[in-house]
Amino acid sequence: GARTVVVATEPFPFASIASGDNHTCGLTANGTAYCWGVNYQGQLGDGTTFSRNAPVAIGGGLRFATITAGSYHTCAISTDGLAYCWGQNADGQLGDGTTTSRLTPTRVTGAPAFTSIVAGSYHTCGLTASGTAWCWGDNVSGQLGDGFPGTDRLSPVAVLGARSFVSLATGGFHTCGLTAAGTAWC
């Protein structure tokens, strides 16, 4: 079939965007989140599983500072530092203590305030202002850094090693942290 190109412009001047396997989310300058694309797992966060060809507002009035997308889930940090996730949760990647998929933003449980958040295919990690990394979700390859590869985590766990990071990056099944000295730990 024919492909459709969606151009998200006014009233959606985005300050940042993130893409998962088949969905994209953007944040406006005032922190409003909009998502579009495939929504079979609720990754758009609009309370449905209907796919959308145009951006739809999500969050019920929540304002976000940053947003990230995994394969079939989305996570964001609210302007007050709280982590929210939605979409597929088969491996605990939403961090709410369950494996229940969520159609709207749901608070990550047991997490400190984060300044940034990143998502791999089926796992998520957050970084605190002090540089501590926390991860949750799929751990088949040890991507959570908790010393227990193969054990999924339904809530955030601190990455081992007592290292302080300035940024985190995720791939499908791995996570890396960058220290202030420029050393990468994966």
Regions found by a protein language model. Name each.
Residues N22, G31, S71-Y72, G81, ...:
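Short coil/turn segments that connect the beta-strands within blades of beta-propeller domains
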Residues H23-G26, C35, H73-A76, C85, ...:
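Conserved core positions of repeat-based scaffolds
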Residues G1-V7:
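C-terminal edge beta-strand
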Residues A8-Y40, T49:
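An edge-strand/N-cap motif at the start of beta-rich repeat modules
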Residues F12, F50, G61-F64, T100, ...:
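Short coil/turn segments at the loop-to-beta-strand junctions that recur within blades
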Residues Y34-A54, Y84-T104, W136-S155, L178:
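Short glycine/serine- and acidic-residue-enriched loop/turn motifs that recur at repeat junctions
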